[in-house]
């Protein structure tokens, strides 16, 4: 299990864009399971939607990508690198995510060759499917250019 400080030591995301609160399970380079506690105070609820707050679907996908990044960047040979989001396939949203929900975010790396890979992501709330997608990524080094 990884807490928020340990997650921040692995991926560079910070508030308001860090969308993972805890990693519950991890197999380095293979899979990870994380959670995001969706608070009524999330900044995106100000405009999405003021009278009917719903977590934007793209942020659910981003949360899945961050969990996948933790799985890949926890591997010794990838430490200190960045995981760049390069594509989405077969993305479907099945249920709305609202304040008070806890998102369970599961990502399995289904292909990794060199710095390029693909993960299968599934997000649920209370055991009900919210989103499923395939996420493509590329690992890169930090540059000061």
Curated annotation (Swiss-Prot):
Query: What's a GO cellular component annotated to this UniProt protein?
Result: cytoplasm
- Protein's GO biological process: fatty acid biosynthetic process; lipid A biosynthetic process
Record has Transmembrane helix as a keyword: no
State any single GO MF term.
Answer: (3R)-hydroxyacyl-[acyl-carrier-protein] dehydratase activity
Q: Which reactions does this protein catalyse?
A: a (3R)-hydroxyacyl-[ACP] = a (2E)-enoyl-[ACP] + H2O
Keywords linked to the UniProt accession: Cytoplasm, Lipid A biosynthesis, Lipid biosynthesis, Lipid metabolism, Lyase
What's its top-level EC category?
Answer: lyase
EC identifiers of the protein: 4.2.1.59
Q: Does the keyword tRNA-binding apply?
A: no
> Where does the protein end up?
Cytoplasm
Residues the record marks as active site: 48
Q: Family assignment?
A: Belongs to the thioester dehydratase family. FabZ subfamily.
Q: What does this protein do?
A: Involved in unsaturated fatty acids biosynthesis. Catalyzes the dehydration of short chain beta-hydroxyacyl-ACPs and long chain saturated and unsaturated beta-hydroxyacyl-ACPs.
The name under which this protein is listed is 3-hydroxyacyl-[acyl-carrier-protein] dehydratase FabZ
Phylogenetic placement of the source organism: Bacteria, Bacillati, Bacillota, Bacilli, Bacillales
This chain is encoded by the gene named fabZ
């Amino acid at each position: 299990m990884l807490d928020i400080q340990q997650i921040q030591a692995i991926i560079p995301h910070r508030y308001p864009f860090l969308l993972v609160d805890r990693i519950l399970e991890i197999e380095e380079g293979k899979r990870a399971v994380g959670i995001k506690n969706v608070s009524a105070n999330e900044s995106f609820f100000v405009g999405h939607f003021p009278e009917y707050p719903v977590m934007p679907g793209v942020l659910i996908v981003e949360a899945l990508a961050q969990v996948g990044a933790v799985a890949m960047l926890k591997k010794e040979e990838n430490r200190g690198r960045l995981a760049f989001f390069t594509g989405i396939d077969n993305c479907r949203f099945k249920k709305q995510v609202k304040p008070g929900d806890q998102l369970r975010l599961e990502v399995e790396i289904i292909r990794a060759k060199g710095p390029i890979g693909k993960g299968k992501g599934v997000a649920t709330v209370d055991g009900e499917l919210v989103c499923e997608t395939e996420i493509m990524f590329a690992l890169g080094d930090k540059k000061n250019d």
